[in-house]
């Protein structure tokens, strides 16, 4: 008998790297999207932490009135934020090497652009990584589809809205109070509360919370008991078991009699599709609403829509909301604007009849 031994050629370093990156046996799946996701998110997080702690004030309105957002300049966790880049920069990309000095880059809010661009790249790579991991495991791709809803919302406030308004200074600040300030100003300028797509978003968030609470409570209340009365019902469950862990027939019967028959799902797949689709579709619509309002296609205006027989205005809640919008409008960027168009009451008057003579 003859035995032939053949030496196996060792894999190249590139092949070993590819095998490691695409392996589904790693504790954390990396994937090709992860190769780009990891450095971009690390860059965004590192710059955010440093800027939140110690960035100097930023001339956000471009009028030489810097706004402080970091902890070392007197803010706390609630009021602190990474202030958006200056209105003097507009939509220009502003990397460090475009500034004359590091101080100038910080003064004009360069860290904001660095953070949001790396963050948006990292987030969309995270979506791609979800699809890639599902593909390698033979799963369907709906996880990344669901994640696309918050991703669309992120892109709408950090990219689409500044593009529509003409400056990254209109982007959402990276902080708690900054987020609320962004919401108030958005309401004042676009009347988002009266936009149908925002109403869908409210229905998606609040309705999704309600549906999740209802589903979780029904499942927890109809667990199939495999233990004695003296033991927790949780001990009767084994990870990966083939049997149903709860009785969907009992849950369907309970909920159908609590409200009415057709308000309850009898099919588990239909139920879980609805639980996933409802908030996702509504957040998609919200992102679409912000993206359209970015180009000033604003919410409905029902101001002074009701008058009596004498022609006098009968105020409605739309008029109350409009007064609140005007209050927000005059409070923000107080020194950056003079007489906003929606507050101008009379005809415009010239402030100078002739050009001044400069002797110098």
From Swiss-Prot:
Pfam families: Photo_RC. It comes from the Bacteria. It is an enzyme of class 1 (oxidoreductase). Tyr-161 forms a radical intermediate that is referred to as redox-active TyrZ, YZ or Y-Z. C-terminally processed by CtpA; processing is essential to allow assembly of the oxygen-evolving complex and thus photosynthetic growth. It is found in: Cellular thylakoid membrane. It is a multi-pass membrane protein. Chlorophyll a PD1 binds at residue 198. Residues 345-360 form a propeptide. PROSITE patterns: REACTION_CENTER (PS00244). A quinone binds at residues 215, 264-265. The chain crosses the membrane at residues 29-46, 118-133, 142-156, 197-218, 274-288. Fe cation binds at residues 215, 272. Its EC number is 1.10.3.9. Chlorophyll a ChlzD1 binds at residue 118. InterPro entries: D1/D2 (IPR055266), Photo_II_D1/D2_sf (IPR036854), Photo_RC_L/M (IPR000484), Photo_RC_L/M_CS (IPR055265), PSII_D1 (IPR005867). [CaMn4O5] cluster binds at residues 170, 189, 332-333, 342, 344. Cyanobacteria usually contain more than 2 copies of the psbA gene. 2 of the reaction center chlorophylls (ChlD1 and ChlD2) are entirely coordinated by water. HAMAP family: PSII_PsbA_D1. This is Photosystem II protein D1 2. The lineage of its organism: Bacteria, Bacillati, Cyanobacteriota, Cyanophyceae, Acaryochloridales.
């Amino acid at each position: 008998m003859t035995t032939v031994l053949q030496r196996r050629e060792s894999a190249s370093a590139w092949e070993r790297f590819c095998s490691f990156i695409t392996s589904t046996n790693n504790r954390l799946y990396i994937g090709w999207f992860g190769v780009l996701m990891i450095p971009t998110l690390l860059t965004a997080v590192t710059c955010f932490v440093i800027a939140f702690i110690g960035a100097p004030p930023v001339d956000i309105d471009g009028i030489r009135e810097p706004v402080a957002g970091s902890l070392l300049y007197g803010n706390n966790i609630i009021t602190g934020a990474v202030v958006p880049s200056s209105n003097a920069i507009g939509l220009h990309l502003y990397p460090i090497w475009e500034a004359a000095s590091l101080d100038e880059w910080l003064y004009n809010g360069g860290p904001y652009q660095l953070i949001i661009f790396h963050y948006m790249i990292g987030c969309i790579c995270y979506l791609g990584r979800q699809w890639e991991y599902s593909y390698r495991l033979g799963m369907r791709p709906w996880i990344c589809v669901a994640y696309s809803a918050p991703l669309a919302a992120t892109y709408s406030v950090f990219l689409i809205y500044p593009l529509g308004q003409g400056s990254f200074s209109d982007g959402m600040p990276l902080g708690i109070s900054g987020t609320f300030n962004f919401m108030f100003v958005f309401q004042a300028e676009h009347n988002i509360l009266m936009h149908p797509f925002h109403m869908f978003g409210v229905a998606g968030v609040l309705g999704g919370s309600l549906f999740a609470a209802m589903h979780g409570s029904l499942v927890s209340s109809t667990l199939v008991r495999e233990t004695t009365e003296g033991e927790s019902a949780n001990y009767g469950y084994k990870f990966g078991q083939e049997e149903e862990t709860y009785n969907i027939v009992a849950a369907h019967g309970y909920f159908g009699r609590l409200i009415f028959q057709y308000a309850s799902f009898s099919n588990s797949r239909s139920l879980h599709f609805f639980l996933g689709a409802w908030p996702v579709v509504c957040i998609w619509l919200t992102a679409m609403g912000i993206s359209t309002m970015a180009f000033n296609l604003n919410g409905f205006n029902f101001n002074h829509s009701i008058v009596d027989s004498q022609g006098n205005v009968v105020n409605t809640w739309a008029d109350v909301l409009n007064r609140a919008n005007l209050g927000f409008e005059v409070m923000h960027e107080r020194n950056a604007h003079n007489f906003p168009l929606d507050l101008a009451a009379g005809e415009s008057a010239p402030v100078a009849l002739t050009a001044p003579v400069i002797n110098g």
